[in-house]
């Protein structure tokens, strides 16, 4: 709905479930956007020097583990980045870095300079509730920065290492094990989803909040899929190129 007298974005509302919510600046972009998604847009003041070689090599390693015969593994670095949508060829014959390239493969200092809110905050809370008192709210906070391809492992390890372990002694075994109370695979998938579905137009970090009885993961933005369709198969991708990587 749109009320012309109020102007934009104040006069625009979108239906979310049973209620009408006031549109945000990101909603305005979605209404007027071109064919390009945010992750395919060119980053100002960035070039190939902002690519972290270690991140690119780690991608090759992971891709080889999944499919040793993957065609992109035969490409040189520039052609690989172009195939992934991480760079675009410009009119001068050079290459411009896209947000896919920066967010997935960018150097840590380049990310801090160009997208300072692209980080993960791991927050440990004492108790089961978020406290209004800022002085006593956090038991521990860790902020983690780096390219997405490297940060998933780092964030997952930070949480898993901090979780209490169980105790298991299998029948006919002399060796006890200490399995984590939360499967690594489940946590990893949740962290990956928080990255690929986050809105990079919103200047907020991803927050992993560990309460004494649960873990919550908050990412900037909202679901592009209507709430009434959440139980249906398929998803609407905010960052399709990043999602494909």
Predicted segments, located by residue:
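Active-site helix-to-loop segments that bind/position phosphate- or nucleotide-bearing substrates
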Residues: 11-245
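N-terminal assembly/transducer modules of large multi-domain enzymes
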Residues: 1-14
């Amino acid at each position: 709905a749109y009320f012309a007298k109020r102007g934009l974005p104040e006069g625009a509302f979108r239906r979310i479930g049973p209620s009408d919510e006031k549109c945000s600046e990101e909603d305005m972009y979605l209404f007027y956007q071109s064919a390009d998604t945010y992750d395919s847009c060119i980053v100002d003041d960035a070039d190939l020097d902002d690519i972290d070689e270690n991140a690119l090599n780690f991608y090759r390693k992971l891709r080889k583990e999944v499919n040793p015969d993957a065609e992109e593994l035969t490409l040189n670095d520039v052609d690989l980045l172009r195939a992934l949508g991480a760079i675009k060829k410009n009119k001068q014959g050079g290459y411009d870095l896209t947000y896919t390239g920066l967010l997935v493969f960018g150097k840590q200092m380049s990310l801090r300079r160009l997208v300072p809110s692209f980080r993960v905050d791991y927050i440990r809370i004492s108790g089961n509730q978020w406290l209004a008192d800022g002085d006593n709210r956090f038991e521990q906070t860790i902020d983690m920065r780096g390219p997405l391809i490297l940060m998933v492992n780092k964030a997952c390890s930070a949480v898993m290492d901090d979780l209490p372990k169980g105790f298991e002694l299998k029948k006919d075994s002399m060796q006890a094990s200490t399995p984590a109370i939360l499967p690594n695979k489940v946590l990893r998938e949740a962290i990956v989803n928080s990255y690929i579905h986050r809105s990079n137009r919103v200047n907020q970090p991803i927050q992993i909040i560990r309460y004494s009885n649960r873990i919550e993961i908050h990412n900037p933005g909202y679901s592009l899929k209507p709430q009434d369709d959440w139980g249906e198969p398929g998803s609407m991708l905010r960052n399709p190129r990043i999602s494909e990587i």
